[in-house]
Amino acid sequence: MECLTVGEPLICLDSMAEPFDAAAMVRKYVVGAESNVAIGLARLGHSSGYVGRVGSDSCGREIVRTLRGEGVDVTRLTATDAAPTAILLKERLGSGRVEVTYHRAASAGSTLDVSDLPDDFTGIRRLHVSGITLVLSPSARAATLEAMRRARAAGTRVSLDANFRRKLAPASVLVAEFERAAALADEVLIGRSEAALCAGSDEDGAGEAYVRSLAVDIAVLKGRGGGATAFTGAGRFDVPAQPVEVADPVGAGDAFAVGFLHILLDGGSLPDALEGGGAVAARVVARHGDYHGLPYEDEFPSTAQFQTAVQR
């Protein structure tokens, strides 16, 4: 398997064009940071798998059916009678504002534990996790960290997307758990607001200095519009933001991870990986839905179309 993800998938109820209390109809679809990445990589021709739990309910069945239909290995996505599948409400409040409300306390996904993991990660090229799972519950946190340890022991590359969710935990907890997990990662993806939170300062350069200090092979600082900066032992690489009309900003970070990991899995360069991440993010935010705009292989731009990243 090329990429295994660990997390919690949810069902989203989207009011589309208005607040929930005014919506006569809603759109329903699968969401989740890690499921978005698993789906995106599968669409681009990579073998991907998902470790997690859903409820033994209709929402859980829809999630399993959707991921399987997208080509994701769901062998380790199990159903439990002990808790329901998590639900997310997405409201459109006008002027591009989106409000998200979680119904995931004591959810099936939060019961994830170490027993759900493969014993041996040999043969898995990459593990991808996010900061969301680290704050779902103590057992989900333990499972995520143990997955990272097992992956490293097997020589599997580990990528961590910060993905801070302030509705799930206080800022101090988000930062502490991220830093604990970052010590087990090879690559870290983090947004500018998240980096500023970790740095404890909004001053220019504070977040960037924090990201540079992370002891990982590659630290990527994501900006708006798909722009990004990567820091490695070889220096700094910058790619500009791409102009795009935003229809739905939710899912942009996951989309960046898809394009970024796709290029790395194909043996591409870091500059191309940054460009690939930006290209997929720009495509996804121009459409409604978390994963619906993720490209298939024949829709992914050729690396020959990418601009040359600036190395400093």
Predicted regions and their residues:
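Glycine-rich phosphate/adenosyl-contacting loop at the front of the ribokinase-like
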Residues: 1-72, 312
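Conserved beta-alpha-beta core of the PfkB/ribokinase-like small-molecule kinase fold
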Residues: 126, 132-209, 226-227
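Glycine/charged-rich beta-loop-alpha catalytic/anionic-binding loops adjacent to active sites
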Residues: 16-25, 129, 235-244
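Conserved phosphate-binding/catalytic region of the ribokinase-like
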Residues: 1, 153, 203-312
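Short beta-strand scaffold segments in enzyme catalytic cores
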Residues: 39, 87-91, 227-230
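Conserved N-terminal subdomain of the carbohydrate kinase-like
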Residues: 47-131, 302-303, 307-312
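Structural motif
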Residues: 2-4, 125-126, 187, 218
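Short, conserved phosphate/pyrophosphate- and ester-handling motifs at nucleotide-, phospho-/glycolipid
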Residues: 41, 191, 253
